[in-house]
Amino acid sequence: MKAIAYRGGVVTFRIPAHWREEYSDLEGGTFYEDRPDSGTLRLKVITVVAPKPLQSCSAMDVLHVVVNGMKSKGVEGTTSGRNDGNAVFKYELNSEEGVRHTIFNWIVANPIPPNRARVATFSYTMLASQRNRSQVQRDLEMLDAEIKATSFSERLGVVAE
């Protein structure tokens, strides 16, 4: 496994050592095994700002705001708090147009008092036909554990690379 210090360490997580990395200012980070039909992990990070300081904004509160609209459109998932004060919303989507894909998503909320929060969105896209392969299941278990262990810089903003 190798550590990824995304945007200089704003978000840090691990991926398999042999996976490739690509970065774009617009598209965020892309991580994948260099083989045909491999799954692709993507990461985007935003910082949200509340108009005034919040009394006790928790990561669960941030997730509620971020995913409330998704849930009203029928997206179902699981939300869990973490011991470090962050929280994760995990859900799955399936594309029905063209080549069928399954997309696993993790939204990780990181509150930054008094009135900001980082939201890291990880998505892992794969061919739907590969969903039940044992290697894919192992990759998903590994990604789930590593994403849930994601850490964030205490500094606000993009850390210089």
List PLM regions with ranges.
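Short beta-strand element of the conserved SAM-dependent methyltransferase core
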Residues: 31-36, 43, 91-93, 104-109, ...
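Short, surface-exposed beta-strand/loop "edge" segments at domain boundaries and coil↔beta transitions
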Residues: 37-44, 52-55, 96-101, 128-134
